Amino acid sequence: MAHGRQQDELQDITLLGNQDNTYNFDYRPDVLESFDNKHQGRDYFVKFNCPEFTSLCPITGQPDFATIYISYIPNVKMVESKSLKLYLFSFRNHGDFHEDCMNIIMNDLIELMDPHYIEVWGKFTPRGGISIDPYTNYGRPNSKYEKMAEHRLMNHDLYPEKIDNR
């Protein structure tokens, strides 16, 4: 029989259930929190669908909107979802290109969790008639996950969807 988590396992989780949250409008990677993966002997994906991502164009200051898909195979640590929400919200006034934002997010999550594998895919709404969909991934070096990352990168968008102004 599976048992729930004990209080001592949750002591580093401070945002979930906290009604007194601060919503930062400037980039804040320090808001990310993690917890232990209780299923380390098994490979499995965790996927976050984040349809309300916003950042700013570094040149014009105009807002950019995207749905971000974050998928990872955890190792020892996992990201806590409310902290991820607040972290993504902190990009609201962050001025960077779409490609930079996706790589920053992936790098911050790698630093937090040290996952076996992670991918971050941003599907931005069109501006000027062009949508940009940066995809970035990482697999632990010298492991099957490194090979997996290479394979997924080469095959990630073989059947692109019809763009219908999202």
Swiss-Prot record:
It is found in: Cytoplasm. One of its GO terms (molecular function) is preQ1 synthase activity. Its EC number is 1.7.1.13. GO terms for cellular component: cytosol. The keyword NADP applies. Substrate binds at residues 79-81, 98-99. GO terms for biological process: queuosine biosynthetic process; tRNA modification. This is NADPH-dependent 7-cyano-7-deazaguanine reductase. It comes from Staphylococcus aureus (strain NCTC 8325 / PS 47). The lineage of its organism: Bacteria, Bacillati, Bacillota, Bacilli, Bacillales. The gene is queF.
